[in-house]
Amino acid sequence: DPATGKLDAFWDGGFTGNPALFPFYQPRFPRDIVIVNINPLMRDGVPKTPVEIADRVNEISFNSSLMAQLRAINFVKKLHQEDRLHDRVMANPLIHMILDDTLMNDLTARSKMMPAPGLLARMKEAGQAAADGFLDEHGDALGDRDTVDLRALFAGSEVVG
């Protein structure tokens, strides 16, 4: 950093992967895990141009560690459902997602590399609206039930509802 002279490097999680979710399986933590998506999980249609293809590859790469974590949670939930795992050993997490795929589908990978103040303001406003919408629609589910159907996610069906 030229301003401070510090030589430490910082990399956004998207370059290395999302933080691990398994520490949250511990019974001492609240069961709710709220994921705030910054990349769409799915898109309608097939990318055709080189830019669209590169953007989708970027999204898939960025989401790959999240999807692996969600598959692990799906397995834990299956073990709980079959009474092969108990809460005192590993919690049965409740999964929620806050997303704004409309905005995220409009953005390209380049917009994430060179964010402009106007874009950041737009994303902040969209994020606040998405969080408010999530709480309005699913606030009563917190602490009680999932708002994401992981089985449907991995079967390719509707995931949030």
Predicted feature descriptions by range:
Residues 1:
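Ligand-binding cleft/hinge of the Venus flytrap
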Residues 4-161:
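Non-catalytic peripheral regions of patatin-like phospholipases
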